[in-house]
Protein backbone atom coordinates (compact mmCIF):
# COMPACT_ATOMS: atom_id res chain seq x y z
CA UNK A 1 0.00 0.00 0.00
CA UNK A 2 1.02 3.63 -0.39
CA UNK A 3 1.84 4.09 3.30
CA UNK A 4 4.35 1.23 3.17
CA UNK A 5 5.97 2.60 0.00
CA UNK A 6 6.29 6.05 1.61
CA UNK A 7 7.88 4.49 4.69
CA UNK A 8 10.37 2.44 2.66
CA UNK A 9 11.22 5.39 0.40
CA UNK A 10 12.50 7.56 3.23
CA UNK A 11 16.26 8.17 3.20
CA UNK A 12 16.65 6.69 6.69
CA UNK A 13 15.02 3.49 5.38
CA UNK A 14 15.81 1.94 1.97
CA UNK A 15 15.57 5.34 0.29
CA UNK A 16 14.47 5.59 -3.36
CA UNK A 17 12.76 7.84 -5.87
CA UNK A 18 10.75 4.98 -7.41
CA UNK A 19 9.76 1.45 -6.50
CA UNK A 20 9.12 -0.86 -9.47
CA UNK A 21 7.27 -4.16 -9.33
CA UNK A 22 7.54 -7.09 -11.72
CA UNK A 23 7.35 -10.84 -11.18
CA UNK A 24 10.92 -11.98 -11.80
CA UNK A 25 10.02 -15.66 -11.30
CA UNK A 26 7.57 -15.48 -14.22
CA UNK A 27 10.12 -14.04 -16.62
CA UNK A 28 10.80 -16.87 -19.06
CA UNK A 29 11.75 -14.59 -21.93
CA UNK A 30 13.26 -11.13 -22.10
CA UNK A 31 9.88 -9.42 -21.64
CA UNK A 32 8.21 -8.04 -18.53
CA UNK A 33 5.33 -5.80 -17.49
CA UNK A 34 6.17 -3.33 -14.73
CA UNK A 35 4.25 -1.20 -12.25
CA UNK A 36 5.93 1.98 -11.00
CA UNK A 37 5.36 3.92 -7.78
CA UNK A 38 6.96 7.20 -6.75
CA UNK A 39 8.27 7.62 -3.22
CA UNK A 40 5.07 9.52 -2.37
CA UNK A 41 3.19 6.22 -2.82
CA UNK A 42 1.42 7.16 -6.06
CA UNK A 43 1.49 5.01 -9.19
CA UNK A 44 3.04 6.65 -12.26
CA UNK A 45 3.39 5.79 -15.94
CA UNK A 46 7.12 6.13 -16.52
CA UNK A 47 10.57 5.95 -15.00
CA UNK A 48 13.40 5.98 -17.53
CA UNK A 49 16.27 5.06 -15.22
CA UNK A 50 14.17 2.45 -13.42
CA UNK A 51 13.21 0.88 -16.74
CA UNK A 52 16.88 0.63 -17.68
CA UNK A 53 17.51 -1.12 -14.37
CA UNK A 54 14.74 -3.62 -15.09
CA UNK A 55 16.18 -4.15 -18.58
CA UNK A 56 19.57 -5.04 -17.12
CA UNK A 57 17.96 -7.57 -14.76
CA UNK A 58 16.09 -9.15 -17.69
CA UNK A 59 19.19 -9.27 -19.90
CA UNK A 60 21.29 -10.78 -17.12
CA UNK A 61 18.61 -13.34 -16.21
CA UNK A 62 17.88 -14.46 -19.78
CA UNK A 63 21.46 -14.08 -21.11
CA UNK A 64 20.13 -11.96 -23.96
CA UNK A 65 21.22 -8.58 -25.25
CA UNK A 66 17.70 -7.21 -25.68
CA UNK A 67 14.68 -6.72 -23.42
CA UNK A 68 11.12 -5.48 -23.85
CA UNK A 69 9.37 -3.66 -21.01
CA UNK A 70 5.67 -2.84 -20.90
CA UNK A 71 4.62 0.14 -18.78
CA UNK A 72 1.08 1.37 -18.27
CA UNK A 73 1.25 3.47 -21.44
CA UNK A 74 4.25 2.41 -23.56
CA UNK A 75 6.24 -0.53 -24.87
CA UNK A 76 9.95 0.12 -24.30
CA UNK A 77 12.74 -1.73 -26.10
CA UNK A 78 16.13 -1.99 -24.44
CA UNK A 79 19.57 -3.09 -25.60
CA UNK A 80 22.52 -4.10 -23.44
CA UNK A 81 25.41 -2.12 -24.94
CA UNK A 82 28.04 -3.40 -22.53
CA UNK A 83 28.13 -5.12 -19.15
CA UNK A 84 26.78 -2.07 -17.33
CA UNK A 85 25.37 0.12 -20.11
CA UNK A 86 21.77 -0.01 -21.29
CA UNK A 87 20.15 1.82 -24.19
CA UNK A 88 16.39 2.32 -23.92
CA UNK A 89 14.09 3.32 -26.79
CA UNK A 90 11.51 5.64 -25.23
CA UNK A 91 9.23 6.22 -28.23
CA UNK A 92 7.99 9.57 -29.52
CA UNK A 93 7.45 12.69 -27.41
CA UNK A 94 3.91 14.06 -27.17
CA UNK A 95 3.27 17.76 -27.84
CA UNK A 96 -0.55 17.80 -27.88
CA UNK A 97 -1.64 20.08 -25.01
CA UNK A 98 -4.50 17.74 -24.07
CA UNK A 99 -2.16 14.76 -23.81
CA UNK A 100 0.73 16.45 -21.99
CA UNK A 101 -1.68 17.39 -20.32
CA UNK A 102 -2.24 21.12 -19.81
CA UNK A 103 -5.41 22.58 -18.34
CA UNK A 104 -5.80 25.07 -21.20
CA UNK A 105 -4.88 25.37 -24.86
CA UNK A 106 -1.78 27.56 -24.82
CA UNK A 107 1.52 27.39 -26.70
CA UNK A 108 3.28 24.50 -24.95
CA UNK A 109 6.64 25.71 -26.28
CA UNK A 110 6.47 29.15 -24.63
CA UNK A 111 4.97 28.85 -21.16
CA UNK A 112 5.61 31.85 -18.90
CA UNK A 113 5.04 31.45 -15.16
CA UNK A 114 5.33 33.76 -12.17
CA UNK A 115 6.37 31.53 -9.29
CA UNK A 116 6.83 33.16 -5.88
CA UNK A 117 7.78 36.43 -7.57
CA UNK A 118 10.19 34.78 -10.00
CA UNK A 119 9.46 35.25 -13.70
CA UNK A 120 10.13 32.04 -15.63
CA UNK A 121 10.15 32.46 -19.40
CA UNK A 122 9.47 30.11 -22.30
CA UNK A 123 9.09 26.83 -20.48
CA UNK A 124 8.60 23.96 -22.94
CA UNK A 125 6.02 21.35 -21.85
CA UNK A 126 5.83 17.85 -23.32
CA UNK A 127 5.13 14.25 -22.40
CA UNK A 128 7.76 11.52 -22.76
CA UNK A 129 5.76 8.87 -20.93
CA UNK A 130 5.07 11.38 -18.16
CA UNK A 131 4.62 15.19 -18.19
CA UNK A 132 7.63 17.52 -18.10
CA UNK A 133 8.37 21.21 -18.37
CA UNK A 134 11.90 22.36 -19.26
CA UNK A 135 13.27 25.87 -18.72
CA UNK A 136 16.59 26.75 -20.37
CA UNK A 137 18.43 29.25 -18.15
CA UNK A 138 21.93 30.70 -17.75
CA UNK A 139 22.59 28.93 -14.43
CA UNK A 140 20.44 25.89 -13.67
CA UNK A 141 21.63 25.68 -10.06
CA UNK A 142 20.84 29.31 -9.25
CA UNK A 143 17.21 28.43 -8.54
CA UNK A 144 16.07 26.94 -5.22
CA UNK A 145 14.11 23.96 -6.54
CA UNK A 146 13.23 22.82 -3.03
CA UNK A 147 11.20 26.03 -2.80
CA UNK A 148 9.86 26.64 -6.30
CA UNK A 149 9.87 23.05 -7.58
CA UNK A 150 6.70 21.99 -5.74
CA UNK A 151 4.99 25.26 -6.71
CA UNK A 152 5.57 24.56 -10.40
CA UNK A 153 4.76 20.85 -10.01
CA UNK A 154 1.36 21.68 -8.50
CA UNK A 155 0.53 24.70 -10.68
CA UNK A 156 -3.07 24.81 -11.93
CA UNK A 157 -1.84 24.64 -15.54
CA UNK A 158 -0.77 21.04 -14.95
CA UNK A 159 -3.79 18.88 -13.99
CA UNK A 160 -1.66 15.75 -13.47
CA UNK A 161 1.19 17.75 -11.91
CA UNK A 162 4.51 17.92 -13.75
CA UNK A 163 8.23 17.19 -13.60
CA UNK A 164 10.38 20.32 -13.60
CA UNK A 165 13.81 20.74 -15.21
CA UNK A 166 16.09 23.77 -15.26
CA UNK A 167 18.61 23.22 -18.05
CA UNK A 168 21.85 25.00 -18.89
CA UNK A 169 23.57 24.57 -22.24
CA UNK A 170 27.32 24.10 -21.79
CA UNK A 171 28.17 23.55 -25.45
CA UNK A 172 26.70 21.90 -28.55
CA UNK A 173 26.95 18.44 -27.02
CA UNK A 174 26.52 18.93 -23.27
CA UNK A 175 23.72 20.23 -21.05
CA UNK A 176 23.61 20.44 -17.25
CA UNK A 177 20.27 20.02 -15.49
CA UNK A 178 18.68 20.53 -12.09
CA UNK A 179 15.51 18.47 -11.66
CA UNK A 180 12.47 18.52 -9.40
CA UNK A 181 10.72 15.19 -9.90
CA UNK A 182 6.96 14.90 -9.61
CA UNK A 183 6.12 12.87 -6.53
CA UNK A 184 9.76 12.42 -5.53
CA UNK A 185 11.21 15.90 -5.08
CA UNK A 186 14.73 17.12 -5.74
CA UNK A 187 16.61 14.30 -7.44
CA UNK A 188 20.19 13.57 -8.48
CA UNK A 189 19.05 11.94 -11.73
CA UNK A 190 15.88 11.44 -13.77
CA UNK A 191 15.87 9.52 -17.04
CA UNK A 192 12.68 10.96 -18.46
CA UNK A 193 13.86 14.49 -17.55
CA UNK A 194 17.01 13.80 -19.56
CA UNK A 195 14.85 12.65 -22.48
CA UNK A 196 12.62 15.72 -22.23
CA UNK A 197 15.64 18.02 -22.07
CA UNK A 198 17.23 16.39 -25.12
CA UNK A 199 14.03 16.82 -27.11
CA UNK A 200 13.56 20.45 -26.07
CA UNK A 201 17.20 21.29 -26.84
CA UNK A 202 16.76 19.88 -30.35
CA UNK A 203 13.42 21.62 -30.90
CA UNK A 204 14.97 24.93 -29.80
CA UNK A 205 17.91 24.28 -32.15
CA UNK A 206 20.37 24.37 -29.25
CA UNK A 207 21.87 20.97 -30.09
CA UNK A 208 21.85 18.34 -32.79
CA UNK A 209 20.15 14.97 -32.59
CA UNK A 210 22.43 13.73 -29.82
CA UNK A 211 23.51 15.31 -26.54
CA UNK A 212 24.83 14.42 -23.10
CA UNK A 213 22.60 15.43 -20.19
CA UNK A 214 24.63 15.96 -17.01
CA UNK A 215 23.16 15.59 -13.52
CA UNK A 216 24.85 16.26 -10.19
CA UNK A 217 26.07 12.68 -10.41
CA UNK A 218 26.72 11.18 -13.83
CA UNK A 219 25.19 11.77 -17.25
CA UNK A 220 22.94 10.16 -19.83
CA UNK A 221 23.29 10.27 -23.60
CA UNK A 222 20.06 11.23 -25.36
CA UNK A 223 19.42 10.79 -29.07
CA UNK A 224 16.32 12.21 -30.70
CA UNK A 225 15.10 11.93 -34.28
CA UNK A 226 11.32 11.39 -34.14
CA UNK A 227 11.93 8.74 -31.45
CA UNK A 228 13.95 9.15 -28.26
CA UNK A 229 16.68 6.82 -27.06
CA UNK A 230 18.54 7.04 -23.76
CA UNK A 231 21.86 5.37 -22.97
CA UNK A 232 23.56 5.19 -19.60
CA UNK A 233 25.06 3.04 -16.86
CA UNK A 234 23.30 0.64 -14.51
CA UNK A 235 24.99 -0.73 -11.40
CA UNK A 236 23.88 -3.10 -8.67
CA UNK A 237 23.79 -1.68 -5.15
CA UNK A 238 22.44 -4.40 -2.89
CA UNK A 239 19.95 -7.25 -2.96
CA UNK A 240 17.49 -7.10 -0.07
CA UNK A 241 14.25 -8.76 0.96
CA UNK A 242 11.37 -6.72 2.33
CA UNK A 243 7.89 -7.47 3.61
CA UNK A 244 5.04 -5.72 1.86
Language-model features: locations:
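A glycine-rich beta-to-alpha transition motif near the start of alpha/beta enzyme domains, typified by
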Residues: 1-84, 133-244
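Short strand-coil-strand connectors
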Residues: 72-74, 91, 116-120, 216
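Glycine-rich, mobile lid/loop segments that gate access to catalytic sites or pores
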Residues: 85, 92
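Beta-strand scaffold of nucleotide-dependent catalytic cores
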Residues: 88, 124, 190
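Ligand-binding beta-strand-loop-alpha-helix segment within the catalytic cores
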Residues: 94-96
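Short, conserved active-site entrance elements at the starts or edges of catalytic domains
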Residues: 102-112, 150, 154-159
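Internal active-site segments that recognize and position negatively charged phosphoryl groups
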Residues: 109-141
Amino acid sequence: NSEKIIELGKRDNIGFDQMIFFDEDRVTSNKASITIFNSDGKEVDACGNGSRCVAKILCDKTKKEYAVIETSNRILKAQKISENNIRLAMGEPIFDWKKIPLSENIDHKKINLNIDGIELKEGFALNVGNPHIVFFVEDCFKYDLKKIGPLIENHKLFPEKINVTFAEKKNANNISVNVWERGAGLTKACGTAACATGVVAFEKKLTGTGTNIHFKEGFLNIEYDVNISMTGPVSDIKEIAIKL
